[in-house]
């Protein structure tokens, strides 16, 4: 690394940083494995590991016992396979979000497990396998009630299973898995949970009766891994829980499951100044100071993933006290009213973290923005350096 690059990176960290605690991630993976002792674990690292950094988090998860990695796009999966130093050869990597004309041949040659939900995808992956001269690893996805990706039950599923059997006989592919995804596993007692489990059992049983012999059957996402033992089957694939965030306040806090949030988002105050009462703050003057006060400028904005919907409501810890965003969050910055306190420029402002030092959590920001904690951590942008600790 050149001196100029090192200085630029150091300056960026001084402005703002997302600290990623890899020891917490490893502990979370171990806690999740204990929740599903009879199943293998797929660490879902899609969307740059929910904003935490895919390759460092993948390595940490594998070190803690994950034997599979999951991504949405094939590009994410190919990047994992190409990482240097490489992941262990026996770690399986699956990707599931395909569009026509995707990099099927590259995926086959990289030994990825690819999801197939429709006949067009079956035709493309078998064509890629024929061209590569290598059997594809295919997982058939069933729509058991989510109404999103996956093959519909009935005639569509029967055709897809039949096509997979014929391709296996030709040596073009191996069906390594049958899988699905829950719609409402984060809502305890929702009737769709039992209905989807029943449908999943029916659809996998049909495929196996026809002659498919998958290595794994899986449907358990984070909430199902944590609360639904009947859904664990051969493999669980937690995503958000691996990063120490609860899938939903309704099922419990991270601490209830022995999980610890992995990301801490902090910045250094760029400016601290005194203003009189009645002073408008930020665009539109949606906040006016109630009296003489101190304002602190936090150099993070919606370009960095701070949700504009949290204007006038997002919590921030400064000098040991919770403060609230004053007025609108702008593209690169927002303001907090510090009352009578006068911290020095450069003082730390913590937006969220585990919460055990008094700081807000990602869930607090989700409540302030009217969204879910998944979005809070995942949307933190590339302008914010990731700083890995406890590697």
UniProtKB/Swiss-Prot annotation:
User: InterPro entries this protein is in?
Assistant: Ala_racemase, Ala_racemase/Decarboxylase_C, Ala_racemase_C, Ala_racemase_N, Ala_racemase_pyridoxalP-BS, PLP-binding_barrel
What reactions does this protein catalyze? L-alanine = D-alanine
One example GO MF annotation: alanine racemase activity
One GO BP annotation is: D-alanine biosynthetic process
| Keywords, comma-separated and alphabetical | Isomerase, Pyridoxal phosphate
Coiled-coil intervals, chain numbering: none
Q: Which Pfam families match?
A: Ala_racemase_C, Ala_racemase_N
Organism's domain of life? Bacteria
The protein's required cofactor(s) are namely:
pyridoxal 5'-phosphate
Question: According to the UniProt record, what class of enzyme is this?
Answer: isomerase
Q: Where is the active site?
A: 46, 283
This enzyme's EC code(s): 5.1.1.1
Q: Which residues are reported to carry the modification N6-(pyridoxal phosphate)lysine?
A: 46
SMART domains attached here?
Ala_racemase_C
Similarity-based family: Belongs to the alanine racemase family.
Instruction: Name the PANTHER family on file.
Output: ALANINE RACEMASE, ALANINE RACEMASE, CATABOLIC-RELATED
Physiological role: Catalyzes the interconversion of L-alanine and D-alanine. May also act on other amino acids.
Protein name stated in the entry: Alanine racemase
Gene symbol of the encoding locus: alr
């Amino acid at each position: 690394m050149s001196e100029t690059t090192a200085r630029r990176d150091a300056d960026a960290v001084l402005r703002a940083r997302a600290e990623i605690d890899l020891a917490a991630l490893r502990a979370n993976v171990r806690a999740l494995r204990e929740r599903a002792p009879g199943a293998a674990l797929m660490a879902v690292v899609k969307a740059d590991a929910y904003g935490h950094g895919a390759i460092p988090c993948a390595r940490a998860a594998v070190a803690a016992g994950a034997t599979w990695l999951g991504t949405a796009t094939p590009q994410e999966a190919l990047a994992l396979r190409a990482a240097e130093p490489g992941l262990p050869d026996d770690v399986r990597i699956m990707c599931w979000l395909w569009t026509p004309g995707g990099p099927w041949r590259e995926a086959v040659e990289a030994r990825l497990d690819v999801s197939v939900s429709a006949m067009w995808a079956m035709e493309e992956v078998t064509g890629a396998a024929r061209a590569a001269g290598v059997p594809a690893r295919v997982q058939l996805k069933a729509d058991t009630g989510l109404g999103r990706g996956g093959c519909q039950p009935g005639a569509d599923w029967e055709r897809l299973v039949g096509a997979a059997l014929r391709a296996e006989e030709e040596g073009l592919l191996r069906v390594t898995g049958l899988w699905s995804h829950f719609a409402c596993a984060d809502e305890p007692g929702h009737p769709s949970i039992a209905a989807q489990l029943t449908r999943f059992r029916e659809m996998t049983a049909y495929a196996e009766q026809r002659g498919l012999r998958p290595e794994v059957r899986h449907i358990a996402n984070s909430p199902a891994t944590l609360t639904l033992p009947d859904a664990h089957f051969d493999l669980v694939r937690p995503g958000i829980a691996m990063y120490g965030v609860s899938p939903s306040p309704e099922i419990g806090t991270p601490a209830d499951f022995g999980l610890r949030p992995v990301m801490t988002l902090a910045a250094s105050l760029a400016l601290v100044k005194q203003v009189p009462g009645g002073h408008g703050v930020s665009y539109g003057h949606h906040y006016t100071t109630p009296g003489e006060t101190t304002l602190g400028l936090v150099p993070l904005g919606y370009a960095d993933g701070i949700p504009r919907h949290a204007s006038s409501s997002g919590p921030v810890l400064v000098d040991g006290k919770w403060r609230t965003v004053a007025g609108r969050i702008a593209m690169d910055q927002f303001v907090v009213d510090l009352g009578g306190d006068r911290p020095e420029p450069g003082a730390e402002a913590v937006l969220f973290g585990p919460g055990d030092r008094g700081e807000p959590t990602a869930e607090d920001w989700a409540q302030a923005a009217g969204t879910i904690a998944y979005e809070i951590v995942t949307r933190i942008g590339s302008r914010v350096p990731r700083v890995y600790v406890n590697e």
